[in-house]
Amino acid sequence: MSKQVFETTLAGKPLRVEVGEIAKQANGAAMIYYGDTVVLSTAVAKAKVGQTDFFPLMVIYAEKQYAAGKIPGGFFRREGRPSEVETLTSRLIDRPLRPLFDDGYRNEVQVVNTVLSSDPEASSQMAAMLGSSIALEISNIPFMGPIAGAHVGRIDGQFVLNPSSEQLNVSDIDLIVAGTKDAINMVEAGAKQVSEEVMLEAILFGHEAIKELCAFQETIKKAFGVEKVEPELLSLNQAIFDEVFAYKGKELVKAVSLVDKQERYDVIDAIKDEVVAHFEQRNFWMTVDGKEVLDADQKKELMNQVKVSLDRIVTKEVRRLITEDKVRPDGRGLDEIRPLASSVDLLPRTHGSALFTRGQTQALGIVTLGSLNENQIIDGLEQETVTKRFMLHYNFPPFSVGETGRYGAPGRREIGHGALGERALLQVLPSEDEFPYAIRVVSEITESNGSSSQATICVGSMALMAAGVPIKAPVAGIAMGLIMDGEHYSILSDIQGMEDHEGDMDFKVAGTKDGITALQMDIKIQGITTEIMKEALEQARKGRLHILSHMNTVISETRTELSAFAPKVKMIRINPDKIRDVIGAGGKIITQIIEDHNNVKIDIEQDGRVFIMHTDSAWLNKTAAYIESLVREAKVGELYEAKVTRLLMDKDGKKIQGVFAEIFPGTEGLVHISKWEKERTESLDGKVKVGDQILVKVVKIDERGRVDLSRKDAL
């Protein structure tokens, strides 16, 4: 097909889509031009059905450094492993796409988005999400889209579509919402303690933009799209299901209601193993060249159906319990939260620590404070260096679920959970001026049965308070679930692992008693209604307040003092023009200051803020006083205790006609003989010598910065 171009506008910027010219061997490909941002989106699917029990979809978002006119760092000078931004954006695009494939589809699909040109004012993330949907829509891949995304901010009570970075700095909402023309199926948000009503309004505002982009894609599909292939779906064989249920179904159903997670899974696994072993004894034969041989394909199909049937029995029972009996596998009511237990100050040498336990999910939180030069450097497409002073890292070791497994670099899930917790707590942190520290929170998941990301938020909040970080308010998180049964539905508070796996929604809400600070929603169905979302938000608010009440019994106020092992920081402000006086040629002066003041750490910002760090407050104060003395500026009319440094002689070198006096380190002025005393004098011989301390007044500072002093006006 020949190249075709489709144009519209998005948030006041031109949006152009080109198809049919680049990457023609992919199933679907589109070039997205948004402002000066250019993204190539491609979609490819394997023709052969995969032998997996899940849908193998891989979404990749890759930022090329050349897109911003930059050469990559590092020894090899080329792009390496995905950055955190790339990983999170890949997940962001994956989440609204995945529900729009048939449940039994098992072909491997890869959607790749490559940022070729980067415009800071035109979001490459939104362009990539749109491009991913278009690439799938115009391909033969059986995708039930289209979907689109919208970035929403709110400034002075007014919603803004696709806000710029400057607008986001003053916005109280940072929301990305995605979905189809009919429903929302993904939400990712950070907010400054906004109400549930405001958040819902923001989501609906974003959905209006989504509807327009979906209509735009329908136009492209009609003009360029190809016929979809009929998917080869993994479907349930009812006869085999009935046979499996007759053999061990009742035992499996009973095991679902065991309260203890480990016991429940152990019993379920044992029953499944017994069923598999039973059906493994069955063989199938076929005739080849007059001989009876084993039919391996038919045997493999049988065992696949047995495993699918076992999973279906568990799924049906979990959903039946909730929708019909209104009780959950562990016996809780639909809005009931698991038992809570917490403590602080577990680790004596850390700067702050806490433990949060909710049912069989447990998180250990640790806070570390450092100097601002320990901020994380973000090496992205921005032209200026971007740093981050608050970091939250989430670790999920295999032992937390009683398993062995891989240890190493964090995966996509760990990075995503850490980012959600970071976003939730960031909203309540003090400003850099109020608390001039780099802050790192680490959440070690020590037990897990669902909602570990929300346990991370709770334990992080308590650990920050225990560390003496003056947060605006405590933050708690809760994960909500949903079971749809036709037109009827059940909303669950504080979902556990089995409910997450078998349910239709994972809706995570974090916030303070006054409002939401973070929101994340993923669903497995094609979308949910506004009414369901509204009800889930209100149920989450009640659950959040319950958890906050518990946390308040453990630690109700931020500690007034930092740990004895935490570094102390003092901030002073100096005239930016005086920074060179503190640093000196080749760093000579600042190096000497550090050596003379017990190896303090000193960070100087371009705006004149100076951060001094040491474990001993006395050295902080001494260093601050010394730096302030270096950069002090004389003021006309001020009195100073000055030290005579030089004598001013007459032209014959016989009589003292004045003195030079240092009013503070680095600044001296002239006291002429006429300004020495009220009575007229011919010479200062015998009246003053080098080293004398005299009281002087600044009477004039000329345009060259020279200071005239008067002794007589100070008397």
From Swiss-Prot:
Record's GO cellular component terms: cytosol
This enzyme's EC code(s): 2.7.7.8
Pfam families with a match to the protein in the record: KH_1, PNPase, RNase_PH, RNase_PH_C, S1
The keyword Mitochondrion belongs to this UniProt entry's keyword annotation: no
Designated gene of the protein: pnp
Binding annotation for Mg(2+): 500, 506
Domain S1 motif residues, every copy: 637-712
Principal location class: cytoplasm
KH domain span: 567-634
Protein's job: Involved in mRNA degradation. Catalyzes the phosphorolysis of single-stranded polyribonucleotides processively in the 3'- to 5'-direction.
Organism: Acholeplasma laidlawii (strain PG-8A)
Annotated protein name in UniProt: Polyribonucleotide nucleotidyltransferase
HAMAP family associated with the record: PNPase (MF_01595)
GO terms of biological process kind: mRNA catabolic process; RNA processing
Keywords, alphabetical: Cytoplasm, Magnesium, Metal-binding, Nucleotidyltransferase, RNA-binding, Transferase
Subcellular location: Cytoplasm
UniProt enzyme class: transferase
